[in-house]
């Protein structure tokens, strides 16, 4: 497209050499978006637009981050969009001197927030703000590594339905963390170079991601950029949910590592931060009808481990998730199988809570069924599955054994079902645990203690695995605090009440695996 000429209030856009997109008769949302985006592109457009915003911290964050970027991204065609968001330490001057020809610099005179910095730079642009096929958001507390961007682009270009990818890192939660055990910057880069080997088996589908650094399709970014209601965190969660509900895959590239220094915000008031997190969580729940934490971070690591302890992994596996909330346990089973070379899976979900239907439907090719638990077999019919995972504690159902029997009836030959049980219903809260230890609550009628005998009599191979991994950190904190209390140190009775044995009895959970004989 040629130059744009302004004549009073008229803008002339020369499109003589452009051709309209040809969509043919294929009804494919993803292909059509790619074709439409290609029409407005220019021959000299870069492959990637890297957006980098900084507010002070020139020496300790910005310089190292950009030095690493220039060194380890030399093989990628990219433009660099630099935004100085009100810095007073020479950041703007450093941007001007940065030895990279394909850069654009925006200077914001006063910092009034990261959202404003991005929007102001975008609005000030004559023409397209993001000119690359892919958008990369690179914070100044990230040190990139060898092959970081190449690996993520390989992932993106493997499937046009992948809309948003993020690498592994340190100083991050959400099971995106990896410890390379390095001693300094040079050692980190050496170990990252060995780690960063593209491997499709390590591309994990997720419901949400924390974008330490992210790659997003530019047309998708323009379709949904951000919801500015999320001023109290959770903007990242919002982006993940928005893109996935549009039908796109959200992928964690666990074959790629970048170093995350941590927040550049100093002097954070922890109480205020916690309050803001809760505000953002409430806003997210109001928008999406689900909780960004409890409904999404149920990775069920131990259930998956118990399931495959003695169960053969199968290609073309049919997997059913029952009451798995938004569906993380289902995706994690798919990821586990993919990591072990089983690339084809079909996911199906059954939920007793309709608010989860939309998120489950975004990735369950086998369909989503919704109804009371006693309608399970009626809804599913005669379908069978290689793996069944049940996401809620079994004592939440009125008749535990009836539910297990009904679900297990849908196992294929050699298939396996995994569910979780407990003996006590105690929240994961230090104060609640302390109160329960002082006055032990009654065992759950539908808990493991009351059901174990009948479970073992079911016509399946039944194995029961006790575990405490989900409360391990909680236990460590609980007893670390107790050891600081003088009465605990000096009083044998108090130590007996708050003993590790009683804690374990209260908080132990059980993975129950049923295998149908071939």
Model region roles, listed by residue range:
Residues 67-77, 336-339:
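Short, acidic, metal-binding catalytic loop of nucleotide-sugar glycosyltransferases
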Residues 207-213, 222-259:
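Donor nucleotide-sugar recognition loop
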Residues 129-143:
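Short beta-strand-to-loop acidic/aromatic patch adjacent to the donor-nucleotide binding site
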Residues 185, 193-218, 232:
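A recurrent flexible, glycine/aromatic-enriched loop bordering the glycosyltransferase active site
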Residues 142-181:
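Conserved donor NDP-sugar-binding/catalytic core segment of glycosyltransferases
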Residues 84-93:
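A conserved acidic beta->alpha catalytic loop
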Residues 57-71:
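Short, well-formed alpha-helical segments that are part of the catalytic scaffolds
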Residues 108-128:
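Glycine-rich, basic loop-to-helix element that forms the pyrophosphate-binding segment
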